[in-house]
Amino acid sequence: MTDKRYPVNKSTKKRSKLKILKWFLILFVLTNIILMFYYDQKVDMFDVKKVAAKRADMHGHNIVTGFTTTVTLLEVADKLINKPGGYLTNDKLPPSAFMDNIPNWEYGVLVQVRDLARVIRNDFSRSQSQSLEDEDLKIADPRFHYENNHWIFPRTESQYSEGIEAMHNYLERLSDNNQEDAQFYARTDNLVSWLNLVEKRLGGLSQKLSASVEKERLNTDLSGDTAATQSTYKPSELKVKTSWFKIDDNFYEARGSTYALIHFLKAIEVDFAQVLEKKNALISLRQIIRELEATQESIWTPMILNGSGFGLFANHSLVMASYISRANAGIIDLRQLLENG
């Protein structure tokens, strides 16, 4: 019961509540800032051979043809959803909701995971077009193609986890010498199928990154075929310029895509070693990997700079586009060498 001789000052109570609210907001902001720095950590590269050997030792697997590629896919997919902060693309609460660099990095990784998972299902695991597809890969592939920003019922992470589990089941059977129905065929035509996808992905990324500076481009959509037509008319000259708000999105998507691709190419070097050696293409592949590794260098500015081509400030997008374009040229040469060499 309040003592009437000492009435409570309403303004004092109000100030006390405001003080508590102020400290709560300060704590909330500081916590989110700390979490943002934690979530924004660079995901480490890993040695595909060591990871494959470690998994083989842990689970008693035999390192057979295709083992390293499959393990590398599993490792990259695991890092996608279990890195510091987990999978952020579908988060609706702070601080993840205010961060777009990591979700774009995740999307870049995801595209490469999807492409490789589909090629393993349709090409690497099948001897010819009339052969049966693997039952576990039939589950894994569509799981990885589930929409990347679904929050609940079901969550995106749960679908990708099911894809990882199905791919792991395929790996278990692949490494078992008594399981003849799980196969991985390291053939030239299979590798060419995947390289065709890779060169399209890298070409698209290079175009988006190069558009950070406004340019006039000639429309080459129908070049090389005098009888070619297209559904919708486009002018012969185009002005292309990436929105300022999309500059860092494209950059981090490319960084994520190349992160995954570096590891996949290193795994391909192991599993397709005989094919590459026969075509004298190992050095070409290693040079492509070296070009892509340059895309993972540390960024020493707090934001992605977008200076003009020969201006005072750097243009991170053009630098990234340069590395990717050189790697893509190498991919095209490698594919042609495998097809015709």
What are the functions of these language-model segments?
Residues 136-174, 284-309:
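Long, amphipathic, charge-rich alpha-helical segments that form helical bundles/coiled-coils
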Residues 48-53, 57, 249-252, 258-341:
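A cross-kingdom marker for long, charged
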Residues 22-36:
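Hydrophobic membrane-insertion alpha-helices, especially the h-region
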Residues 160-289:
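Extended amphipathic alpha-helical interaction segments
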Residues 50-159:
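N-terminal Sec/ER secretory leader and immediately downstream segment
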Residues 36-48:
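Hydrophobic single-pass membrane-insertion segments
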Residues 1-16:
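N-terminal Lys/Arg-rich, disordered targeting/topogenic segments
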